[in-house]
């Protein structure tokens, strides 16, 4: 979480810095643009030829020396937000050159209608010439090269015919400025598309490894997943920055950034699930080891203790439950004394051994209720470490049993009013009477020779209580639903029969008025 928060913070800073620089550069470029447009507008043919010449020169530079393109890509961290404005500056200078040519034409012919007619489509053609390179970058590179190689020949011939050094200087500026801008833009767009795909594939590979290994993933796998997440975050940040900086024409890069965002979310979820699985496995291993150690200690204590003959399983479970109640009452009344502490230790050891044997029996398939046994495992593992915390946990469990008994008594009172389940009444009433009668037999046992029977009876009793309460609650809900349906039917019938005489149809207006 900390790493993700830091990455989001850095992403916000990286988005804020280009925006401020964009505003400053835009103000400067807008002033230059207005200054050149105030002189004279440009003819469309010459601006399109200059844009095509800049495209061809950028393509030749990218094909001849790829080292320059890689260096320009490495410098994109600080310069990727400036290439668009270099293009804008280059077009503004080309407008100045075009204005000079048009002034010469007007001086020769003495006609002012030439500039007025061509002032409209000039900026549009310039924008189309600059944006056509970005739009058709990956679809038709060869056709653009073949069609553009003819344009610089005519441009060179036109430059040979001109004799003014001022126009040649302006032409060199136009060629040099968009050349750097287009080369950086081309390398940036292609590298982002290809690099984003490679990062996405590597990150998908990490996620598939996590899915295949599942529970068996160790710490190196989690480290690898974190590295994949960091890679995905960096790739997503790069693609988002490129999409925001070139939002005039780079629609494909923005699509790539959207494609990269979704796998990053999926891999975050997969890494979280794998980490939770690892934690749950470690907890299970710890609880199993504690259960084994406690079972060996309790077996020794049972060998040294007194062996008592077999009793009825119901009597054993009732005496166990009421033993803890009486111990809690004695501790609350008499305070922490030596005898109560010894009795609490003995009872905690007995209860821990019982819950451990419940875990073993459930692992064999005797008791198919894993949630309660898992809670008891956690409580008993804590009790084996600290006896005081164990007595507190058992006091909580006994308070829960008291609440369950009170709820069962309330459900008995309600079931007497609605005699729908007599069997549930009899079983719950017998259990309540037995629980009250067994309060006199507290502190009668210290070691049980057969604890499996008593534990199974406890689990069966708890299941019967839950089943009885569920059946009673379901019967109550059914009765309430039936009453609601009957009332709604009565209301509809009354509304149908009590309509006014004049209202013959179903609409709200009465026909008698």
UniProtKB/Swiss-Prot annotation:
Residues 143-162, 245-257, 296-307 have a biased composition (Polar residues). Glycans are attached at residues 25, 285, 324, 345, 351, 413, 426, 467. It comes from the Eukaryota. Residues 101-119, 208-220, 275-287, 376-386, 417-426, 503-513 have a biased composition (Acidic residues). Its main location: nucleus. Keywords: Biomineralization, Cytoplasm, Extracellular matrix, Glycoprotein, Nucleus, Phosphoprotein, Secreted, Signal. One of its GO terms (biological process) is extracellular matrix organization. It is found in: Nucleus; Cytoplasm; Secreted, Extracellular space, Extracellular matrix. GO terms for cellular component: endoplasmic reticulum lumen; extracellular matrix; extracellular region; nucleus. Residues 1-16 form the signal peptide. GO terms for molecular function: calcium ion binding; extracellular matrix binding; integrin binding. Residues 163-180, 309-325, 484-502 have a biased composition (Basic and acidic residues). Phosphorylated in the cytosol and extracellular matrix and unphosphorylated in the nucleus. Phosphorylation is necessary for nucleocytoplasmic transport and may be catalyzed by a nuclear isoform of CK2 and can be augmented by calcium. Phosphorylated (in vitro) by FAM20C in the extracellular medium at sites within the S-x-E/pS motif. Residues 46-60, 337-354, 427-442 have a biased composition (Low complexity). Expressed in tooth particularly in odontoblast, ameloblast and cementoblast. A motif (Cell attachment site) lies at residues 364-366. InterPro entries: DMP1. Pfam families: DMP1. Residues 23-513 are annotated as: Disordered. May have a dual function during osteoblast differentiation. In the nucleus of undifferentiated osteoblasts, unphosphorylated form acts as a transcriptional component for activation of osteoblast-specific genes like osteocalcin. During the osteoblast to osteocyte transition phase it is phosphorylated and exported into the extracellular matrix, where it regulates nucleation of hydroxyapatite. It is linked to Hypophosphatemic rickets, autosomal recessive, 1: A hereditary form of hypophosphatemic rickets, a disorder of proximal renal tubule function that causes phosphate loss, hypophosphatemia and skeletal deformities, including rickets and osteomalacia unresponsive to vitamin D. Symptoms are bone pain, fractures and growth abnormalities. Interacts with importin alpha. This is Dentin matrix acidic phosphoprotein 1. It comes from Homo sapiens (Human). The lineage of its organism: Eukaryota, Metazoa, Chordata, Craniata, Vertebrata. The gene is DMP1.
């Amino acid at each position: 979480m900390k790493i993700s928060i830091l990455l989001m913070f850095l992403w916000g800073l990286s988005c804020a810095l280009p925006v401020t620089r964009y505003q400053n550069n835009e103000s400067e470029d807008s002033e230059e643009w207005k200054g050149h447009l105030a002189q004279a507008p440009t003819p469309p043919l010459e601006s399109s030829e200059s844009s095509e010449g800049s495209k061809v020169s950028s393509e030749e530079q990218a094909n001849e020396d790829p080292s320059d393109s890689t260096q320009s890509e490495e410098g994109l961290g600080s310069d990727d937000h400036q290439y668009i404005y270099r293009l804008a500056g280059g077009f503004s200078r080309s407008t100045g050159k075009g204005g000079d040519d048009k002034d010469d034409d007007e001086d020769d012919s003495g006609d002012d209608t030439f500039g007025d007619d061509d002032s409209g489509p000039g900026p549009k053609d310039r924008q189309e010439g600059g944006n056509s390179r970005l739009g058709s970058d990956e679809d038709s590179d060869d056709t653009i090269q073949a069609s553009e190689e003819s344009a610089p020949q005519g441009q060179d011939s036109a430059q040979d015919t001109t004799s003014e050094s001022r126009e040649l200087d302006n032409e060199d500026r136009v060629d040099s400025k968009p050349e750097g801008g287009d080369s950086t833009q081309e390398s940036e767009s292609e590298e982002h598309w290809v690099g984003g795909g490679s990062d996405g594939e590597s990150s998908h590979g990490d996620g598939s490894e996590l899915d295949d290994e599942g529970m068996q993933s160790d710490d190196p796998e989690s480290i690898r997943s974190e590295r994949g997440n960091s890679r995905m975050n960096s790739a997503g940040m790069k693609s988002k920055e490129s999409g925001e900086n070139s939002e005039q024409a780079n629609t494909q890069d923005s699509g790539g950034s959207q494609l990269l965002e979704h796998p990053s979310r999926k891999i975050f979820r997969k890494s979280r699930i794998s980490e939770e699985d690892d934690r749950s496995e470690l907890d299970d291993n710890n609880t199993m080891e504690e259960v084994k150690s406690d079972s060996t200690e309790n077996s020794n204590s049972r060998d040294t203790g007194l062996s008592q003959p077999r009793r009825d399983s119901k009597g054993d479970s009732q005496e166990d439950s009421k033993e803890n109640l009486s111990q809690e009452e004695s501790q609350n009344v008499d305070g922490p004394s030596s005898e109560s502490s010894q009795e609490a230790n003995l009872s905690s050891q007995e209860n821990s051994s019982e819950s451990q044997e419940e875990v073993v029996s459930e692992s064999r398939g005797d008791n198919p209720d894993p949630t309660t046994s898992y809670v008891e495992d956690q409580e008993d593992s804590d009790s084996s470490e600290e006896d005081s915390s164990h007595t507190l946990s058992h006091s909580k469990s006994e308070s829960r049993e008291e609440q369950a008994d009170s709820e069962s008594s309330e459900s008995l009172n309600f079931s007497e009013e609605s005699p729908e389940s007599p069997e549930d009444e009899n079983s719950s009433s017998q259990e309540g009477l037995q629980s009250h009668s067994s309060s006199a037999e507290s502190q009668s046992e210290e070691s049980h020779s057969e604890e499996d029977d008593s534990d199974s009876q406890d689990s069966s009793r708890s299941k019967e209580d839950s089943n009885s309460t569920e059946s009673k609650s379901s019967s109550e809900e059914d009765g309430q639903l039936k009453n609601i349906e009957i009332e709604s039917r009565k209301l509809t019938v009354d509304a149908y029969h009590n309509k006014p005489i004049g209202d013959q149809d179903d609409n709200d207006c009465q026909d008698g008025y």
